[in-house]
């Protein structure tokens, strides 16, 4: 009987899905779909490859220098967020809201932005010569 109980416990813990509650810390390969995160969070340098962030809300969130390769950001809300120098290689962002979002220096290679909304930010730089 003890062996059967041990086997059941072992199977439950070894085959645990990588699911997280919305309050759990962000990490690799986790399903955070449909979560609403606090506005204006500093998540700079987050490690989120292969994560599911679909239908999640990240308003004015700092994702600068984050690694989000192969993640699903579809139908997420990311207005006024920053992804400066973030790695979004092969991420899926179908139908996501990126209005006033800053992607300066980000790796957007093979990202699927089909149906995503965005507003282009034009930055003006003043160069002074002496």
Regions found by a protein language model. Give the residues of each.
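Sec-dependent N-terminal signal peptides
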Residues: 4-16
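Tandem repeat scaffolds
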Residues: 20-130
């Amino acid at each position: 009987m003890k062996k059967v109980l041990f086997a059941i416990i072992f199977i439950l813990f070894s085959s645990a899905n990588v699911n997280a509650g919305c309050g759990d810390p962000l990490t690799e390969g986790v399903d955070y779909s449909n979560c609403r995160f606090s506005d204006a969070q500093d998540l700079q340098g987050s490690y989120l490859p292969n994560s599911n962030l679909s239908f999640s809300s990240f308003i004015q969130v700092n994702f600068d220098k984050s690694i989000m390769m192969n993640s699903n950001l579809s139908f997420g809300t990311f207005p006024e967020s920053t992804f400066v120098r973030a790695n979004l290689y092969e991420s899926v962002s179908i139908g996501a809201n990126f209005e006033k979002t800053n992607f300066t220096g980000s790796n957007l290679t093979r990202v699927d932005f089909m149906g995503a909304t965005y507003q282009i930010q034009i930055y003006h730089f003043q160069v002074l010569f002496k």
